[in-house]
Amino acid sequence: MTDSQALVPGPSPPHSKAEICYGATFFNISSYGIMEKYETPTVIFGYALPLLELQIILIFVCIVLSHMFLRRIGIPRFVSNILAGLILGPQLLDLLEYSSDRLSLDIPGNVALEGVARLGLVMFTFLMGVKTNKRAVYQIGKRPIVIAVSSFFVTMISGLAFRNFRLDKVDPLYMPLRLAPTERSVIVSIQAVTLLPVITHLVYELKMSNSELGRIAISTAAVSDFLGFLTLVCISYVGTYRYVSPGIANRDIVALIILVLVILFIFKPMAQRIVDMTPEGKPVPKVYLYVTILTAIAASIYLSVFNQMYILGALLVGLAIPDGPPLGSALEARFESLVTNIFFPISIAVMAMKADVVRALYSFDDISFNILLLGLTVVVKWTASFVPCLIFCELPTRESVIIATIMNYKGFVDLCFFDVALRRRNLSRATYTVMIIYVLLNAGILPTIIKALYDPKRKYIGYVKRDIMHLKTNSDLKILTCLHKPDNISGAISLLELLSSPLNNDNKDRGVIAVTALHLVKLAGRTFPILIPHDKRSKARLLQNSYIQTMMLAFTEFQQENWESTTVSSFTAYSHENLMDQDICNLALDHLTSMIIVPSGRKWSPDGEYESDDIMIRRVNESLLDLAPCSVGILNYRGYNKGKKKTNSIINVGVIFIGGKDDREALSLAKWMGQNSRVCLTVIRFLSGQELDKSKNWDYLVDDEVLNDLKATYSLANNFNYMEKVVNGGPAVATTVRLVAEDHDLMIVGRDHEDYSLDLTGLAQWMELPELGVIGDLLASKDLRARVSVLVVQQQQQHG
């Protein structure tokens, strides 16, 4: 019996002589029960399965007890997982050492628990890859690249500059002098990189996944992770080439390239094929789910065989899964609860168990510079992330602080890197302990700071201009049109026909109209909301829903008639009423739309008479006006195209211009329509009878500039008219609006005119539809005799 075994109470574990001789880890799996040996019932823990069960029970007891207290102060469960591992570590219960002695003569006696822990990491990393917003990963703009490059390289260079500082003070008993720079390089490298699965987990935990801020964070993490991946591969290749064998180094890098190619050109198309073959609204066959999970596990095993970071395989497979239903959502629904609540906590606790606080305190003098280096890299990385956000990306200060804080967040993949470095002896046990405690504090403090700074009501705020007024020359006009009922289809298409101009497609100063049609269906009989894309491949598997078929046929016909100037993509969203505005905003963010067009909710009969108001649609519109990441247009349609042929009828479009950003946006939209030969555009500017000093008001100056530009553009056009009307007081405004409406088929007006000289307060008190603004409410009134449709425009709400 060894010294370590002599310290363990109870009988010796049931090893054979051969096992003792070779120090092997072969052991019996299941026992005969607790009564196998009545005098010493603990003998059952000499078997793998009962011991594993005891280990898991102890882990969850510690997690639950820790979280009972920590959750009261808002600390995430991830911290409780680490804390449970520290409680069960050498400084207190020393579970791993005890378990090792029960099964074998060396540490690998915990192979069963280690296996469960690694499986948990693989599964959780895979799910994070599945849940990652693929558009944020694959459609990366300049801002995330700048932030990621700055934070990665500035941190890496600054940290490595101090790598050899005070090496002469390192105690050879703590670590050989030649290994000390390697340990510091590990610290700097892991600090420099921001890992995509970790940030995905954080963004989902903070419920930021649908916000633009969350998308910036994920895109930035994707770039940083890619840079870290390349760095890791290069370092691994050079190290293996120099210190092991050139042949093995070449073999490992070729194996990695083969896996990436297989995932890109075989697995990813197969996953897309599964999605295409699954009928819309139907679940994916279970066999595909299990095959997908096994593929992720196999990819991880494959990489571990070739000396690569094993969880990378699971991440690559997860990123290859198409977003949302049916496959991605099914994987989340089936495996997320098991992995998140069972496997993942075990994985974190097992890695934390290897930390030895007592040893770290004993070696404090030797690791003190490592602690200083860790603090330095934290400050440098935060600064290197904050400055580009604020200066180059022009994000508001609060959002810049949030992004910089997110970039410093550390999580489960970082723990995995530390664990691998410890096993490869690139980290000492004392430094490993410091890094575990650092992640513990990091994961407890940073999310709390982010929660305090992040306002969920601002989740869809656009940090770049997404409106029609600021579109660049030759840019496509991206419009998201929303439909709640079949009655909304004709109005939406009639409006879009005015924006497209197939007869004047030789205009080189404008792009095409990129239309995204979203059919919103109130959720009934479904547990989870679902977004279904429609494309050519989905025609054979359409939902048996006549409304959706009608929508698709109508928009398909519209695209065929305007194929030179228009593209159309269609979606159906099954959603709860209170989440419809979020579905609209999410799709608008994904497609970078300039304007969302929604129906007003007021229904008119075929002969133009008022029928009813839909309260649900009005509530959705009110929320959308507050949340939208781009401009919004609310269409009150009364059938201006009735009795008119599409090819030769003239549509009289009027714009009432009072002033302000909403009116300027309405004018920009009308300018697009003016290029259609079927449109006769009239701009009516309302002026106050009072004399004003316009030179002191910036908005007045901008209004004049926009109007002058419009008049110059259409100075020679036969289909453009401009007039000015002087109105004094609310009654005069109402009368003039009603008279103007009689001469037009469609009126386009801005929503907000609060800062302007026209006295509209009296009219505001009598509004029936506040979401349309004062002028829009007048034009949508039940009492208005003129059969005119109205589009009320609100420009993108930007916040500094």
Curated annotation (Swiss-Prot):
The chain crosses the membrane at residues 43-63, 73-93, 110-130, 145-165, 186-206, 216-236, 247-267, 287-306, 338-358, 371-391, 401-421, 430-450. InterPro entries: Cation/H_exchanger_TM, CPA2_transporter, Na+/solute_symporter_sf. It comes from the Eukaryota. GO terms for molecular function: antiporter activity. Its main location: membrane. GO terms for biological process: potassium ion transport; proton transmembrane transport. Keywords: Antiport, Ion transport, Membrane, Potassium, Potassium transport, Transmembrane, Transmembrane helix, Transport. It is found in: Membrane. It is a multi-pass membrane protein. One of its GO terms (cellular component) is membrane. May operate as a cation/H(+) antiporter. Belongs to the monovalent cation:proton antiporter 2 (CPA2) transporter (TC 2.A.37) family. CHX (TC 2.A.37.4) subfamily. PANTHER family: CATION/H + ANTIPORTER, CATION_H(+) ANTIPORTER 9. This is Cation/H(+) antiporter 9.
